[in-house]
């Protein structure tokens, strides 16, 4: 595979990685608030969504490292 280093594609993947990471942090934060307020089921949904965002970020990072 051709190297992504310095390409627009590499920049786009890095932006996507940052977005997935930020989304995970938001969902984790909102989940903690929901749990604190007693909305356990809502907190679980936020936690599951945060885990999905984490997996997306891991795949993007792995791709940048040449692991895919």
Regions found by a protein language model. Name each.
Residues 1-68:
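Non-heme di-metal
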């Amino acid at each position: 595979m051709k190297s992504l280093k310095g390409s627009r594609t590499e920049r786009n993947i890095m932006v996507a990685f940052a977005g997935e990471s930020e989304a995970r942090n938001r969902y984790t934060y909102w989940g903690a608030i929901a749990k604190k307020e007693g909305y356990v089921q809502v907190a679980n949904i936020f936690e599951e969504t945060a885990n999905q965002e984490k997996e997306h970020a891991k795949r993007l990072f792995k791709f940048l490292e040449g692991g895919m």
